[in-house]
Every structure is written in structure tokens, then in C-alpha cells.
């Protein structure tokens, strides 16, 4: 089958920089993705786009919902807050959230515990999957277990983090209206990232666990910043130690850092239907891998050993929420790209 006109035009420069055997691997991975509702696929190495393709409803300048892939922005935003002297990962949340101070368990929660999803607070807060609470609703969520004792995936910790950041911005008088305004000023604007949309709650605050919609290229730019240690055009945009901490796991889940998945044996995934944890052992055999992942198999892969960023976006998020990962395999997809 002949490549689409969009693929051909976009791929002209890529062919010049990627050997023919690499292009063949990328084409095979594209076919695998497209057959599973894929609408965008991009490979970047050492900051240069090697392959880029759009199918179906995908377009180069069309943003696509990241679903829970949105979560990984929070870990890097925390590293920017550390650089600005507004936050420490080891600080108690109760320093900023007085609602936590008199609570047996919540008084011991650190910022890192929130972002590791081991705060002791139920991640879903008793809500159905995809139901995001307001900041106030999340802040009222109780804790019934010691901090660090259990991994609990869901939107509640991210919305609590959003309120914590909002209060810090108000106290510091940064001029940022909310966490998204801060994220935009500190990271998105310097990188040239322009979210197409970002969902907000009934309180007017941006959702941090989901809701971002950006282009494949913009997601790749974000991934490249992380691979580069937070340095862009010679300038450090975040605290390097705090960024490194994004990829340090908790004792409760060896496969999750500060908002990033790190597939390895013993990993606890986001849910029984996600398919992520089931491939943790095989994925660990591909080398060092960090991943932002969302429903519908939205993916941002970071492969430090290859200095490579891979973006995959897909249609059918709602369908995925109902039926799980389907026959998608991260291991198969990455093996096609890497020739592993």
C-alpha cells in the first residue's frame, strides 16, 4: 500500500536522517498502531524528528486528548516549583493545607507522597473511573491508612496537588491565576507548546489528572525536555534533582515514580484492564523506559539509553474506558520500533 500524502510529505526529511532499515521498522510500527485506532505516531531522537505520521482523524496541528497522559505534567511542574523556591518534595502538605494538620494520617503526607500516589488517600475517592473531583472535593477526601503503605491510582491526589499549588501561587503573588497558568508560563511557553484545550472543573480550576489536549509534536517537545534533564536551549527550566526524583519509585510500587510509569517487575498498574502492568517484565527487557500513559493507549515513551522520544495517540478513548486496552501491546509496538 502506498503511503498517504501526509506521510510522504512529512517523511521526506526523515528519510534523509534515518537509515532505510529504521524507516522500515517505523512503518511496521505505524501499521500496528493504525490497526488499533492510532491517529498519530512520532519518533524523535536527539531532538530531531525521524518519523511522523497521521491517520484517520489525526492531523499534525490537531491536538488530541491525552487522558491520564496529562498526569505526568504534574511531576515536572513540581520540579519547576522547586527551582522557584515555592516547593520542596519532602515538605508536609499540611504546611500549605491546614485542613490536613489535625488528621492522624493526612498530617504526615508529603508532596512526594501525593505524586507517588501513596498518600493513604483513596485515589478514586469512591468515584467512577474518569470522574474528576473539584479541588475542594479532593481536599475533603479522608485517609484511612498510613502514608506510604499502599499505591492508589486515581484523580484525587492530583486535584489535591492542584489546590496546594494554587495556594502557593497566591501566597507568593506570582501573578499566575492557577496551576495551568504557571505550567504555561514556566514550561509550555519556553518550549513553544500550545495546548489546544484543557478541561476545567465546575470550580473553574484545571484538571491535573486528565483533560489536556495537545499535538503529537508538542507532547514530544515536553518529552525531549525531560530527556535533556530539564534543559532547553542551554537553560535549566526545572530543578535537576527534583526532575531526577520523578523517576525514583516508592516502596509501595516499584513501577511508578512521581507521575511517570517505569515498567519493571513488581509494578502495580492503573487498573486491571489497562494491560500496562501485565507487560512490565517484558518491557523492562527493552532497557530503561519511562512512560506517560492514558486511556485509549495514548503514550509518551522516553527511552534515555537511545535518547529517543516516541509519541502515540489514538481514537476511541471512551471505548477504551469501557473495554480496557484491547489487543494493544506496548512491548510489541516498541519492539517493532527498536528492532528488539
Spans of model-derived segments:
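N-terminal export signals
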Residues: 2, 7-22
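A short, well-structured edge-of-sheet supersecondary motif
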Residues: 29-59, 300-303, 307-311
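Structured C-terminal helix/loop/strand segments within mature extracytoplasmic catalytic/sensor domains
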Residues: 289-340
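Active-site SXXK
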Residues: 47, 64-90, 114, 161-165, ...
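Active-site helix/loop module of the DD-peptidase/beta-lactamase fold
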Residues: 83-119, 170-210
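Active-site-proximal alpha-helical segments within enzyme catalytic domains
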Residues: 157-165, 211-231, 298-314
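Short, charged, amphipathic alpha-helices and their helix-cap/turn boundaries
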Residues: 51-53, 94, 124-147, 151-153, ...
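Active-site Gly/Thr loop motif
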Residues: 194-195, 249-309
Amino acid at each position: 500500500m502506498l503511503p498517504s500524502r501526509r506521510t510522504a510529505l512529512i517523511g521526506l526529511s526523515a528519510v534523509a536522517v534515518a537509515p532505510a532499515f529504521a524507516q522500515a521498522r517505523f512503518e511496521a510500527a505505524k501499521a500496528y498502531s493504525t490497526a488499533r485506532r492510532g491517529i498519530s505516531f512520532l519518533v524523535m531522537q536527539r531532538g530531531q524528528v525521524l518519523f511522523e505520521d497521521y491517520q484517520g482523524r489525526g492531523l499534525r496541528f490537531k491536538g488530541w486528548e491525552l487522558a491520564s497522559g496529562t498526569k505526568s505534567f504534574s511531576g515536572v511542574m513540581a520540579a519547576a516549583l522547586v527551582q522557584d523556591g515555592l516547593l520542596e518534595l519532602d515538605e508536609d502538605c499540611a504546611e500549605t493545607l491546614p485542613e490536613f494538620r489535625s488528621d492522624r494520617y493526612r498530617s504526615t503526607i508529603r508532596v512526594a507522597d501525593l505524586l507517588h500516589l501513596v498518600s493513604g488517600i483513596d485515589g478514586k475517592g469512591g468515584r467512577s473511573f474518569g470522574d474528576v473531583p473539584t479541588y475542594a472535593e479532593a481536599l475533603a477526601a479522608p485517609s484511612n491508612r498510613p502514608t506510604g503503605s499502599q499505591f492508589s491510582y486515581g484523580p484525587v491526589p492530583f486535584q489535591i496537588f492542584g489546590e496546594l499549588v494554587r495556594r502557593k501561587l497566591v501566597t507568593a503573588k506570582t501573578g499566575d491565576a492557577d496551576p495551568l497558568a504557571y505550567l504555561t508560563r514556566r514550561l509550555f511557553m519556553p518550549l513553544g507548546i500550545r495546548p489546544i484545550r484543557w478541561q476545567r472543573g465546575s470550580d473553574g480550576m484545571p484538571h491535573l489528572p486528565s483533560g489536556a489536549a495537545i499535538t503529537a509534536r508538542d507532547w514530544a517537545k515536553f518529552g525531549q525536555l525531560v530527556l535533556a534533564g530539564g534543559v532547553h536551549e542551554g537553560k535549566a527550566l526545572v530543578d535537576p534533582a527534583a526532575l531526577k526524583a520523578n523517576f525514583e519509585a516508592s516502596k509501595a510500587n516499584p513501577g511508578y515514580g512521581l507521575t511517570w510509569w517505569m515498567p519493571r517487575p513488581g509494578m502495580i498498574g492503573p487498573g486491571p484492564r489497562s494491560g500496562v502492568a501485565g507487560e512490565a517484565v517484558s518491557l523492562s527487557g527493552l532497557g530503561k523506559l519511562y512512560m506517560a500513559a492514558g486511556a485509549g493507549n495514548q503514550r509518551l515513551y522516553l527511552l534515555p539509553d537511545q535518547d529517543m522520544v516516541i509519541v502515540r495517540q489514538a481514537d476511541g478513548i471512551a471505548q477504551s474506558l469501557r473495554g480496557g486496552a484491547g489487543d494493544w501491546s506496548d512491548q510489541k509496538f516498541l519492539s517493532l520500533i527498536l528492532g528488539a
